[in-house]
Design a protein with these regions (language model features):
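Charged, solvent-exposed interaction patches on well-folded alpha/beta domains
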Residues: 1-89, 94-264
Length: 264
């Protein structure tokens, strides 16, 4: 069998040259990591335009205060893990991720805790409850959510008022109409609407030690009460006038008890 050494030599040389060219192209076109600096910082916050407390300006300010804002810094000295851990110390941050790219970009991705109700109790406590029924501290920022006042301790706020607020917010009508929850000494619940000069009394929330059934029980309770109120709004107040009554009691089934304003 005749071996064509010339052909084999040519093929081998072609392979060597091809491999070298690929290596050289990759090597000389790759950025010099030692001299690469951060040219842009992308701060992405999930739900930034809703009722959260975070914005890109605040995040930049927080990182600058810790001397961790990466813009203009050598990329090799940008500590992505430290940036993540620093941002996670904020009581308003749920998750934080930071990554670097070879073209000098630093990307920061945040998800935030979303407040669903603000608590202003009779004992002068002032804080928020988030969408996971956990306490958030007060802040200089405000957002358009329900305020709960009255006889509220932190246990009741987390276990019941947060669920009541969620139930109201899931309905577009009540999300726009109800602006305040007031808890009486016996835990009876009053609702203060945006439209209409009256107070709505719905009674006591159903209480249970079964966590998995508590939310459903409160949802059913709220839906039942507010469906009746919606019908009363539609067929009663629309005829009598929105400011005719000062107190509307929908605690009991099959009846609505109203108290007129003194000048009505």
């Amino acid at each position: 069998m005749h071996i064509n050494w010339k052909k084999i030599t040519i093929i081998t040389l072609d392979l060597i040259i091809g491999t070298y060219l690929v290596f050289a192209f990759t090597k000389f076109n790759k950025p010099d990591e030692a001299n690469l600096v951060c040219t842009k910082v992308n701060i992405n916050i999930q739900d930034e335009m809703t009722n959260g407390f975070l914005n890109a300006k605040e995040i930049k300010k927080r990182l600058e205060a810790r001397k961790l804002y990466p813009l203009g810094e050598p990329l090799k000295e940008v500590n992505a893990r430290m940036i993540e851990e620093t941002l996670k110390t904020s009581p308003f941050v749920k998750t934080a991720e930071c990554s670097k790219t070879q073209d000098g970009l630093v990307d920061i991705y945040l998800t935030q805790r979303m407040p669903i109700v603000r608590i202003k109790s009779i004992s002068n406590e002032d804080y928020y409850i988030d969408d996971h029924n956990q306490i958030m501290p007060n802040t200089n920022y405000t957002c358009d959510i329900i305020i709960a006042t009255g006889y509220i301790n932190k246990w009741y706020a987390k276990k019941y008022i947060s669920l009541l607020s969620k139930a109201l917010m899931t309905n577009e009508l009540w999300r726009n109409q109800i602006e305040q929850i007031n808890v009486l000494p016996d835990r009876g619940i009053e609702l203060v609407p945006r439209v209409g000069n009256h107070i709505i009394y719905i009674g006591n929330l159903p209480e249970t030690n079964l966590i998995d059934k508590r939310e459903q029980a409160i949802n059913d309770f709220v839906n039942k009460k507010m469906n009746r109120l919606e019908k009363f709004y539609k067929y009663g107040l629309s005829q009598a006038g929105w400011n005719k009554y000062s107190y509307i009691n929908i605690e009991f089934d099959n009846q609505i008890i109203c108290k007129k304003h003194q000048n009505s």
